[in-house]
């Protein structure tokens, strides 16, 4: 397993992609998970500079692990526009040399779907996968509240319903724990589809609401309860023991303040634990 940082951690800071790449390299990250908004802006407005940074990434054996975006598959959406956005993401993914696109399976809880609604969402997800498949690109659905992948049973059912070789999972361990499932058991049951992990933690279940999108994306949103991996309620020592021998990236998804300081310390803690395993 390798570690990547998320550019979304720097969503409210004035920091260049150049600085992020250098920071990642200096602190032992092997990849960068690129927020879709950042990817689009770099391609449209800073193409020449970014091309140099992409070359720098290669030289330092770093990579863009995934583009994390949001594809609207709601029945009220203009699905043609969603498919056009998928075409744009193919261009971006090729440019950044990645073959993974993260999105969400809708915007409401799995229990709130009628049988017919679910069928229509399944068909839309399959169509999106069909668009990316000729480019050898994978769609990764994130395990997340208020989506069709908000519980382990619904996630497994959705994978079976869509039944597409280019549909995969980004396993967010905090959110699968939030659903009431055991994170390690979830890993084993979803393992055939997993292509990426999200690592983050919280001090108490009382503060899980701080990860709701409207709060996360607000510059003045609450960050109470957001804590480093090994200081929270989810047991990451146990999780890492299970997943460390896999070939996937784990992104440290830090949404709180002082992103550079926290990410630097997280990598030190992860490195120390790795050294302890090797020496024991």
List each model region and its residues.
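The substrate-binding groove and active-site-proximal loops of carbohydrate-active enzymes
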Residues: 71-79, 227-230
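N-terminal-biased segments
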Residues: 5-18, 35-50, 81-86
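Active-site acidic/histidine proton-transfer and metal-coordination neighborhood
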Residues: 19, 56-59, 75-169, 261
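Glycine-rich, proline-tolerant flexible connector loops at the mouths of alpha/beta enzymes
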Residues: 33-58, 106-112
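Histidine-acidic metal/acid-base catalytic patches
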Residues: 1-4, 9, 14-28, 58-61, ...
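Active-site-proximal loop/turn and secondary-structure-junction residues that shape catalytic pockets
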Residues: 9-11, 36-38, 70-73, 105-109, ...
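Catalytic-core regions built around general acid/base machinery
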Residues: 48-60, 124-131, 186, 238-242
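Conserved beta-strand positions in the central sheet of alpha/beta enzyme cores
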Residues: 33, 66, 102, 140, ...
């Amino acid at each position: 397993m390798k570690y990547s940082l998320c550019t979304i951690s720097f969503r409210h800071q004035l920091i260049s992609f150049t600085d992020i790449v250098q920071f990642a390299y200096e602190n032992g990250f092997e990849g960068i998970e690129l927020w879709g908004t950042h990817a689009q802006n770099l391609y449209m407005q800073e193409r020449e500079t970014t091309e140099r940074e992409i070359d720098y990434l290669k030289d330092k054996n770093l990579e863009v692990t995934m583009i994390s975006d949001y594809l609207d598959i709601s029945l009220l959406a203009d699905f043609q526009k969603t498919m056009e956005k998928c075409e744009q993401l193919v261009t971006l993914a090729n440019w950044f040399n990645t073959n993974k696109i993260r999105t969400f399976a809708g915007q409401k809880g799995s229990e709130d779907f009628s049988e017919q609604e679910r069928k229509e969402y399944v068909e839309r997800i399959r169509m999106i996968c069909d668009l990316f498949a000729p480019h050898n690109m994978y769609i990764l659905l994130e395990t997340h509240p208020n989506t069709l992948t908000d519980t382990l049973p619904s996630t497994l059912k959705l994978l079976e319903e869509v039944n597409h070789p280019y549909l995969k999972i980004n396993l967010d361990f905090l959110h699968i724990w939030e659903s009431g499932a055991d994170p390690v058991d979830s890993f084993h049951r979803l393992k055939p589809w997993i292509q990426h992990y999200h690592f983050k933690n919280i001090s108490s279940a009382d503060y899980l609401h701080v990860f709701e999108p409207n709060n996360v994306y607000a510059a003045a949103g609450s960050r109470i309860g957001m804590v480093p991996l090994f200081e929270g309620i989810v047991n990451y020592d146990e999780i890492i023991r299970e997943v460390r021998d896999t070939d996937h990236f784990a992104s440290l998804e830090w949404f709180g303040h002082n992103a550079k300081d926290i990410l630097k310390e997280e990598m030190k803690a992860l490195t120390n634990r790795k050294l302890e395993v090797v020496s024991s």
